[in-house]
Structures are given as C-alpha cells and as structure tokens.
Amino acid sequence: MTNIRKSHPLMKIVNNAFIDLPAPSNISSWWNFGSLLGVCLILQILTGLFLAMHYTSDTTTAFSSVAHICRDVNYGWIIRYMHANGASMFFICLYMHVGRGLYYGSYTFLETWNIGVTLLLTVMATAFMGYVLPWGQMSFWGATVITNLLSAIPYIGTNLVEWIWGGFSVDKATLTRFFAFHFILPFIITAIAMVHLLFLHETGSNNPTGISSDADKIPFHPYYTIKDILGALLLILALMLLVLFTPDLLGDPDNYTPANPLNTPPHIKPEWYFLFAYAILRSIPNKLGGVLALAFSILILALIPLLHTSKQRSMIFRPLSQCLFWTLVADLLTLTWIGGQPVEHPYIIIGQLASIMYFLLILVLMPTAGTIENKLLKW
C-alpha cells in the first residue's frame, strides 16, 4: 500500500515540498533564511492576533490600549515585545536572504526572484503601517512624513495623499485604515510566499557553486528539516534574548510619548530597517528626486537579473565581484548609520556619497566586474 503522505491529495503537497523534496547536498546555512522567514511570519501572525484582541484603533485610545496590553493583560508585555522585535528579526532574515540571492546568483530564477521582490515591498509596507499603530510621537510623525512623500507626484499628488489620509491630516481615519491593512497584509504575504515556494520548486534550489546539482540530490527530510529546526531555535534564542533583556534597544524613545500634532520631534526617523532607504531619500535636495531615488533603491533589485554579465552564476569563484559585493554591504551599513543621524555636516555629504556609491556599485561597477572576469578567464 502507498504511504498516506504520497497518496492523500493534501499530504502529497506537503510531502513534495518538505519531505521527499530533492535538495542539493551542499547548500550552506545561507539557505536557512527562507525557513526562518516562515518562522518569523507565523510568529508575527500569532503575536499580532493576540495584540489585535486588546488593541483599539482610535486616536484617543490607541496609545492607552498599548499601555494596557503591557500592564494589565496576562503576558501582554512579552507578546507586544515579541511582535515589535520579531519585526526586526524578520528584516534581518529578509536582508540576509536577499544578500544570499545576490551573492550566489539565485536571481536567475526570474519568477522566484520577482515574487521575492514583491514580497519584500509588501513586508515593508506592512511594517510601516504597524509602526503607526501605537500612536506615539514617532508613529504619528513617521506616518505624516512618509505618506506626504506621495504629494511629490505631479498633478495627482495632493489628492492622493488626502485620499490615503482620509482627511486633511493623519487622523482617526488614517489610523483605522492602517490597522485594517496591517491585519490583512500578513495573510496576503503568506499567499504570495506560497507562490514564491511553488516557483522555487519548479526549478529546485540553487547551491553555493551555482552549477546544476541534479547529479547529487538528497531528500529534504531528515537532512534539511533538522538543519532548519536548529536555525529556528537559534532565531528564537536571539529574539528572546532581545525581548527579555533589552526590549527597547531597537525602538525609539519618542514613541513612549503620545502623538501630538502640535509638537514635532527634533529628529524624525523610521525604524532601523528602513534607515538605509531614508538616508537615500534625504541625500537628494529635491522632493520628487528623493522620492524616485527611494523607490528605485528597492525596485533596483528587479533589474539585477538584467545586469548579470558574468558567464558564472555564483560569485564564489569571482574575487573581483566579491570585493564589490562586500563594498555594497559596507555601503548599506553606512547608509543605515547616516539615516539615524541629524541632517548636518558631515552627515549630509557622507549620505550623498554613500547614495551615489550604492547605485554606482549595482548599475555600473558590478556588471563591469563580471565582464572583466570573463575576459580574464578568456571566455
């Protein structure tokens, strides 16, 4: 008799995706981040669900309801901090996952890569709307500043911003709709992630060498299930260390002050995971130019497959490209640091140079390096 996992219509899908899936024998820990993102997503949905049971999306009570969750709800504080710091973990895993894709040339799986870019944008939108919900000072002013950027769009800009706000400023209508979207989007993300996985399983995983691994496959279970469980345990350990010892390390102190439209905080800045994009936005003195640079800084990922010039897929045997890749990582860390600094000398010029470097590396230097490496290898 055939095993139930191979014959049952539902179990068959699970079996082909997580049990009998043929996987390359040499994929490293950099391939763990996909499953870690799944763990993060489930964690965020569960903690978010319990927070939504006690949260009220009204401007007069939102801040108090979050304080109530932390003070009066059983284990409310741990649920709240797991959700807030879980978002940071989510983005650490996301950036590592994207970085892995860039380094090992995983972007040549076009459908998988483009759905991944869509996922990144959706997660960023979800995180932004979630940051507005506690209705602290940074929540309010962050929402005001970021939504206001859309007013740079010619002709329809102002109407678009007022349509998103649901009025003439960020107010009750804005908070209510942001809560509604923040609640629904994770489920949409789950659906898109399933499509992401579907397309990945059409081609099979890439591996560190970037060459076909058809000659040497191993079953996903038990090898990679064990590996993924270890990764998940380490992720949860890191998260719980953050939650239990320094829960406010990555937050902004201004968010412990209730939102006040009459008092602007001295330094308006987003959460740490958006600082690199914020630095690029601020480095251009023109509003529309800044908005376009901000959008392009993320959308540039969709162009990566078109910019691949090397005859080799992975960077593992390409020292020139490796140098440029790690320069890009250093550049992104520099931008993240600059995004959190005030707009004054020398931070302005550092931010502008780092922004130019970011686009130069991706659009010019890395494709050039690929061509040079081909020439050096007489290909």
From Swiss-Prot:
Residues binding heme b b562, per UniProt: H83, H182
UniProt-annotated location(s): Mitochondrion inner membrane
Cofactor(s) the record lists: heme b
Assigned GO CC terms: mitochondrial inner membrane; respiratory chain complex III
Membrane topology: Multi-pass membrane protein
Transmembrane segments: 33-53, 77-98, 113-133, 178-198, 226-246, 288-308, 320-340, 347-367
One GO molecular-function entry: metal ion binding
Superkingdom assignment: Eukaryota
GO biological process: mitochondrial electron transport, ubiquinol to cytochrome c
This protein's record includes keyword Heme: yes
Annotated heme b b566 binding sites: H97, H196
Alphabetized InterPro entries for the sequence: Cyt_b/b6_C (IPR005798), Cyt_b/b6_C_sf (IPR036150), Cyt_b/b6_N (IPR005797), Cytb/b6-like_sf (IPR027387), Cytochrome_b (IPR030689), Cytochrome_b_C_euk/bac (IPR048260), Cytochrome_b_N_euk/bac (IPR048259), Di-haem_cyt_TM (IPR016174)
Keywords: Electron transport, Heme, Iron, Membrane, Metal-binding, Mitochondrion, Mitochondrion inner membrane, Respiratory chain, Transmembrane, Transmembrane helix, Transport, Ubiquinone
Keyword Mitochondrion: yes
Cofactor binding summary note: Binds 2 heme b groups non-covalently.
Entry binding sites for a ubiquinone: H201
Family: Belongs to the cytochrome b family.
Subunit: The cytochrome bc1 complex contains 11 subunits: 3 respiratory subunits (MT-CYB, CYC1 and UQCRFS1), 2 core proteins (UQCRC1 and UQCRC2) and 6 low-molecular weight proteins (UQCRH/QCR6, UQCRB/QCR7, UQCRQ/QCR8, UQCR10/QCR9, UQCR11/QCR10 and a cleavage product of UQCRFS1). This cytochrome bc1 complex then forms a dimer.
Name of this protein: Cytochrome b
Organism, scientific name: Bos mutus grunniens
Taxonomic classification: Eukaryota, Metazoa, Chordata, Craniata, Vertebrata
